[in-house]
């Protein structure tokens, strides 16, 4: 994505999408409802505790970036909604996948299908893969596939609203097997060097003996 959101903007945008799909009768959201959604303990990773003023700052930034706006619907209490349908032409399956990625971070296809059921029913994994493919094929792409983690059978996917995701240290750490092989290789190299040094020392001793013998012939 060309625009990079901070962590709070990501959380607010994810909550607006989620609540539109799960509780449309209460959408658009008041500031209080949106703050509660941001601090919700279920379906969130990480779990946050934020004040309304932080949510307001995030909303103002999202409005400036044309990703959210103040709803024009009647009522004395201001309410807010996202603009991804108008701005990016996203459909409910795409919104559901993006909401999950925004609210929980990188996930596998299976995790997205299971967790996204509350927002949109996916008949099978292929349906989720199709949605991910469409989101990755956009210009600019909205989603990326991450390198497969050590010990995992499946790759995870991440949103790009906050730029390219940083790979966790765990993803870059060699597996125990790889680490063990590295140590074994180092040990073999050291043993070989020690053997070569011992051989050189023997040769030096032999050369000294020969030199001494040669000298003794002239004494």
Swiss-Prot record:
It comes from the Bacteria. It holds the Pfam family DUF480. Belongs to the UPF0502 family. This is UPF0502 protein Gura_0277.
């Amino acid at each position: 994505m060309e625009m990079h959101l901070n962590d709070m903007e990501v959380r607010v945008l994810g909550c607006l999408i989620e609540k539109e799909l799960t509780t449309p009768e209460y959408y658009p959201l008041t500031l209080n409802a949106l703050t509660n959604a941001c601090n919700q303990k279920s379906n969130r990773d990480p779990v946050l505790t934020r004040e309304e003023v932080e949510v307001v700052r995030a909303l103002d930034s999202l409005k400036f970036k044309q990703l959210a706006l103040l709803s024009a619907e009647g009522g004395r209490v201001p309410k807010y909604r996202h603009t991804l349908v108008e701005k990016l032409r996203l459909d409910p399956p795409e919104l559901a996948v993006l909401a999950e990625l925004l609210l929980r971070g990188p996930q596998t296809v299976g995790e997205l299908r299971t967790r996204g059921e509350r927002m949109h029913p996916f008949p099978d994994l292929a349906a989720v893969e199709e949605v991910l493919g469409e989101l990755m094929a956009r210009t600019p792409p909205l989603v990326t596939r991450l390198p497969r983690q050590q010990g995992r059978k499946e790759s995870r996917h991440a949103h790009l609203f906050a730029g390219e995701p940083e790979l966790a240290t765990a993803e870059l750490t060699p597996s125990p097997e790889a680490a063990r092989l590295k140590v074994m290789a180092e040990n073999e190299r050291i043993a070989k060097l020690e053997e070569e040094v011992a051989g050189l020392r023997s040769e030096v001793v032999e050369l000294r003996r020969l030199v001494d013998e040669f000298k003794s012939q002239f004494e």
